[in-house]
Amino acid sequence: MRLSQMLFVTLREDPAEAEIPSHKLLLRAGYIRRIASGIYAYLPLMWRVLRKVSQIVREEMDATGAQETLLPQLQPAELWQESGRWETYAKAEGIMFSLDDRQQRQLGLGPTHEEVITAVARDLIRSYRQLPQNLYQIQTKFRDEIRPRFGLMRGREFIMKDAYSFHADEESLRQTYAAMDQAYRNIFRRCGLQFRAVEADSGAIGGSASQEFMILADAGEDEILYTEDGRYAANVEKAVSLPAEAIASAFTTFEKRETPGTDTIASLCEFLKADPTQVVKQVLYQAVFDNGKLLPILISIRGDQSVNEIKLTNELTRRAADYGAKTVIALTVPDAEALKKWTAAPLPLGYLGPDLADSAIAVNESIIPKFLRLVDPTAAELQNFVTGANEVNFHVVGANWETNFPKPAVVDLRTALVGDRAQHDSSQVLASARGIEAGHIFQLGLKYSQAMGATFTTENGTEEPLWMGCYGIGVSRVAQAAVEQSYDKDGIIWPVAIAPYQAVVVIPNITDTEQVAAAEKIYADLTAAGIETLLDDRDERAGVKFKDADLIGIPYRIVTGRSLKEGKVEVVQRASKESSVIAVGSVVETVQDWIAAAIV
């Protein structure tokens, strides 16, 4: 491709809208153009990158026996109502674009396709003889993000590969899940990316097990906790660990003490000369279910720990049926205004105890009149602890569960921390890294098939629900994440496997007929050898061309400059900036060798 004929415009300054390096560089280098908040045009260079990522994904999916298909982007609300997710996606979280057609039928623009594919399977899969099946698509998805940001990382429109598998039993599901795990590892390796596979929360997708694939980058939105022995890695939302050992309490007698002005853990510990590990603090939450009911929640947790709200949301979802609901649509720490709406009197915040009376809740038909009381294991195991006395400026010391307070249900709700000991080996401690979630695989189990009546006839003639898995990769996110992982002050450094072009031939002086002729010959030879090559034949200064070549990140640059007089050209490797002068006749072989060495 001749650069003089390409729609190619670069920017010298970082766009004001861009926050992270990869977003700045993709805009500056002419890969993408913002159309509206979270909506981008993929320009010719970017589309080539996306096609390459998609092709690698296709090859690895096809190698597992998965079959490519294409599902509708417009999805009827009835399917989502069958699964119970319409309220969550279209209203509670509000991430699904929804609309009414001219017959006033509700539709959604697909952020994901579990419901549609389950409906297809329900109609077409009849017998165990048809199983297993694994179908995938590469398609544009839509999410009405509250705050679109970071370019293609969190947009309202994005390209994704999503696959869905159907099975006769759980063992078959596990086998496909393992095959997808390996396929994803192959994909990210072939794309030239550094990544970690980590345990993850299943979120609104649901299911019994899930794993994320994180592309390592300092600007990643997700925190990963891992051990150096390579045996454990998890998203911080899911991570578990052994917390620091609690210091033995010096308070051996239960008594109420005046503790003026100690409504924080720090001030309380300073006043009592105690350690935060000796304190049980109460954290107040309120949850709203999809039936409109508000549930007050009282969490007891050790003073040096914090509540993981993802874990709490999952626990509330498991208990939703106890309150006549299906799911949680909001979870918040109530502020003063929120508390006024459901408390009978002002609460002694900062001094709450585990036995805060249910009578503190105002009588209201929309409010559940009893606290859900949960205790984290870090607090449940403490003895002779310090906690609030439910009275401003007062705490109790030397407290014990069952003796002084009923012990609530024990549930792991703490956020794992850097430096915590690993559960699999207490000599290993958790370290932290930032990552960009680029892939996610789930064992869905029977969640959707049971809800939507997708069954098959077993070998014994009985009707059973289909076992399901789903497997997603953000194709457009992978492309930008590659930039976030590999760039320098001059621009993008594309992995060779997904670079839009593998080589660029630069003519420093377009009026020099010798340079032009040599460049044309090298360009033709590289192209004939199957090397994807750009020819920078623009009427621009050499410095502009060199800067643009670095900015757009083409792996290998060939310059037909002064060395032509000796029958040689300069070749520059973008990643290392290593420059060498070689014979014109050696260019094709040299570039071929570099490409072969770089592509896994």
Curated annotation (Swiss-Prot):
Family annotation (PROSITE patterns): AA_TRNA_LIGASE_II
The protein's UniProt keywords, in alphabetical order, are: Aminoacyl-tRNA synthetase, ATP-binding, Cytoplasm, Ligase, Nucleotide-binding, Protein biosynthesis
Q: Top enzyme class of this protein?
A: ligase
Q: Which CDD domains match?
A: ProRS-INS, ProRS_anticodon_short, ProRS_core_prok
**SUPFAM superfamilies according to UniProt:** Class II aaRS ABD-related, Class II aaRS and biotin synthetases, YbaK/ProRS associated domain
Q: What is its EC number?
A: 6.1.1.15
Q: What is its main location?
A: cytoplasm
Any one Pfam family here would be tRNA_edit
A GO term from the CC aspect: cytosol
| Superkingdom, natural source | Bacteria
Q: Where, subcellularly, is it found?
A: Cytoplasm
Q: Which reactions does this protein catalyse?
A: tRNA(Pro) + L-proline + ATP = L-prolyl-tRNA(Pro) + AMP + diphosphate
GO process terms (BP): prolyl-tRNA aminoacylation
The entry assigns this protein to a family as follows: Belongs to the class-II aminoacyl-tRNA synthetase family. ProS type 1 subfamily.
Functional note: Catalyzes the attachment of proline to tRNA(Pro) in a two-step reaction: proline is first activated by ATP to form Pro-AMP and then transferred to the acceptor end of tRNA(Pro). As ProRS can inadvertently accommodate and process non-cognate amino acids such as alanine and cysteine, to avoid such errors it has two additional distinct editing activities against alanine. One activity is designated as 'pretransfer' editing and involves the tRNA(Pro)-independent hydrolysis of activated Ala-AMP.
Subunit structure, briefly? Homodimer.
Q: What's the domain remark here? A: Consists of three domains: the N-terminal catalytic domain, the editing domain and the C-terminal anticodon-binding domain.
Q: What's the protein here called?
A: Proline--tRNA ligase
Source organism per UniProt? Synechococcus sp. (strain ATCC 27144 / PCC 6301 / SAUG 1402/1) (Anacystis nidulans)
